[in-house]
Amino acid sequence: MFKGGEKMEKEQRTYDETLEQHEDAQSEQAPEEQVEQVENEATQQEEKDELTVAYEKIAQLEAKLAETENRFLRLHADFDNYRRRVRLDMEAAEKYRAQSLVSDLLPILDNFERALQVQVEDEKAKLLLQGMEMVYRSLIEALKKEGVEAIESVGKPFDPHVHQAVMQVDDQNYEPNTVVEEFQKGYKLKDRVIRPAMVKVNQ
């Protein structure tokens, strides 16, 4: 009977010791797990912070890239416009290269036309006028080759782009706003008016 009780006490002590060791082991492991969890959370937070910083840097770089692209596009457009203006200026210079010469020749044409309208009876004077007319026609042909042409006026509707009204009349024989007389010829070089025609216009 005594032996049986002693055996039970021994088993009870063994159980208690085992339980105590288990509890000690748990109490020893718990702080380590907590430390590991804290470290993991800290690591995750650091990674999150680093990722946030990286995203911010990426956003800044993308903004700078967009700004650089926009500036490049503006510069490219400005250069294209500049190149187009230069080309147009060169084309205009080539197209209207004779403008200065033509402007200087117009008064000479006017003098030829006034001289050719003079009525003469003397044969020598007639021969002189014939020679002048030949020179005049040669000059007109040379100017035509450069694109110079006289502006039509009499009987045409008044056009302020090519006509300069210096007088107005009320003539029932003409439609209103019609050129009835030309005082001085106007000329165009290709599509550019070198000198408008001086005209009389019906009201």
Curated annotation (Swiss-Prot):
GO molecular function, one term: protein-folding chaperone binding
Predominant cellular place of this UniProt entry's protein: cytoplasm
A single BP term in Gene Ontology: protein folding
Keyword Cytoplasm part of the UniProt annotation: yes
Localization in the cell: Cytoplasm
Gene Ontology CC terms, in alphabetical order: cytoplasm
Function: Participates actively in the response to hyperosmotic and heat shock by preventing the aggregation of stress-denatured proteins, in association with DnaK and GrpE. It is the nucleotide exchange factor for DnaK and may function as a thermosensor. Unfolded proteins bind initially to DnaJ; upon interaction with the DnaJ-bound protein, DnaK hydrolyzes its bound ATP, resulting in the formation of a stable complex. GrpE releases ADP from DnaK; ATP binding to DnaK triggers the release of the substrate protein, thus completing the reaction cycle.
Subunit structure as annotated in this protein's UniProt entry: Homodimer.
Entry-linked HAMAP family: GrpE
Family, as annotated: Belongs to the GrpE family.
Record-given protein name: Protein GrpE
Species for this entry: Anoxybacillus flavithermus (strain DSM 21510 / WK1)
